[in-house]
Design a protein with these regions (language model features):
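Hydrophobic alpha-helical segments, especially N-terminal targeting/anchoring helices
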Residues: 32, 89-90, 154, 176
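Adenine-nucleotide phosphate-binding core of ATP-dependent small-molecule kinases
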Residues: 53-71, 191-194, 199-238
Length: 238
């Protein structure tokens, strides 16, 4: 006897969250549902500049990205916006303490926050990438970010660990090669100078994408550079 069993589940499209990735030359946008499934994504070329015009452009692109929702739906269905930025970020003060990639120091993010009518959360790019992983599965993990600069993040006990000064995952300035290549920070031999994506192209005007194409075409110089890069990366990880 008794009532028949009913299957109850979450409606994944009941609410959404938006993610924005800011880099020196691009803007990435993604919309996810309650199951963390990507509903929509877009990447456009947009050069970062540290004035209000950039904030307005980001707001305009975000509005177009969400044009399938009207204002009322956005307020009702959009839980918030997470924005990832390369650099050391103070979320409480909404401040970029320092970003070499964007050439910023003590830069207020309040104008960018005001461009949206929903809660906005800021995070370092590597920390954001770590949070995008399943931290319940990977209770203790290290994330290594190989972009324009080298960074990383720690997951300890299923929680992101940023450290007192938000610098816990800044692996880029560990000395990898004593008296080695000059780093932008002023020191010599930093891991960033050897393992950031820019190390693959060196002083050439090629992009990383162009380098990878050369590698696919079995270019001898590119193959040699790639092997050298992997050697340094292996030393860093070990």
């Amino acid at each position: 006897g008794g009532r028949k069993a009913k299957s109850i589940g979450i409606n994944p499209s009941y609410r959404y969250a938006m993610g924005i990735v800011i880099t020196a030359n691009h803007l990435g946008m993604v919309l996810v549902n309650l199951k963390y499934e990507i509903v929509k994504s877009e990447r456009i070329r947009l050069k970062f500049v540290s004035d209000m015009s950039y904030c307005s452009q980001v707001a305009d692109f975000a509005a177009k990205f969400l044009d399938h929702m009207n204002d009322a739906e956005q307020k009702e269905k959009l839980l918030g916006v997470g924005i990832s930025i390369p650099g050391i970020i103070n979320q409480e003060q909404k401040l970029v303490i320092k970003s070499h990639a964007l050439k910023l120091e003590n830069y207020s993010l309040s104008f960018l926050e005001q461009a949206f009518s929903v809660p906005v959360y800021f995070s370092n790019d590597a920390n954001a990438a770590m949070m995008a992983e399943d931290m319940n599965t990977y209770q203790n993990a290290i994330y290594l970010s190989l972009n324009q600069t080298l960074g990383g993040a720690f997951c300890i006990g299923g929680k992101l660990f940023s450290g007192e000064n938000q610098k816990a995952g800044e692996f880029g300035h560990m000395i990898l090669v004593p008296q080695g290549r000059k780093c932008y920070c002023g020191k010599s031999g930093c891991a960033d100078a050897y393992c950031a994506a820019g190390a693959l192209v060196g002083e050439s005007k090629d992009s990383v994408e162009q380098f990878m194409q050369l590698l696919q075409n079995n270019d001898e110089k590119a193959e040699k550079k790639w092997e050298e890069y992997l050697d340094y990366l292996a030393i860093l990880i070990s």
